Amino acid sequence: LGISAFNLPHGFCIVDDIVYLTDREDSVCLKYTSDGKPLMVLGERGVHSDIGCEKTGDLVPRAAGPFNYPSEMFPAPSGDLYVSDGYRNSRVHRFTKDGQLIQSWGVPGKEAPGEFHLPHSILIDEEELVYVCDRENSRIQVFTPDGEFITMWTDMTRPNDICQSKDGDFYVAESSFQGSTPGISVRDRQGKVLARWDSRSAHGLWVDSQDNVYLALTGAESVDKYMRRD
């Protein structure tokens, strides 16, 4: 892809051999072929929406349109693109496959459904339900494709990333909070914990077709792999 193409790449994922990621510092979302051919840029490089705050990670005074330090872009089966806009905003944005904004939802907050404090990762399942890692609120919120709140999972600490295995189970990378140990939790479709183990603190994770788990460690600048044992 070329190192000069990015300022701070974030939220990297591959779906159907297409690469999706954000450039957090430049406030753009990017789409590439697997061999690095640019397909789409959402946003204007270096132009950040006005949320009344310039400190990354703080609870922002107000929500705004796309983008201000977006954290991840993920495609839905329909082709729509969803973005968690994240580090200096508190919204989810939904676009057509051609990059036209359909809608946005979310406001800054710490408790109520639809309130976010650093939506850090986003996942769309085969039913087009939207899962948002509301990291600084230590929960995952689940929405319909139109942004209607369904439920939230709260038995976790600072979820950095979420992905889904081929069997439909969800894997969540949880980071430490107030002395807790970072780890990985495996959950069913209702959010019930099926398994949990301690790990190094992962900023991102992915599960392959064999249910092996890969953790991206920003602090250690490395990748850990966990192999499934049947």
Named regions from a protein language model:
Residues 33-37, 96-100, 144-148, 187-190, ...:
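Short loop/turn segments that connect beta-strands within beta-propeller blades
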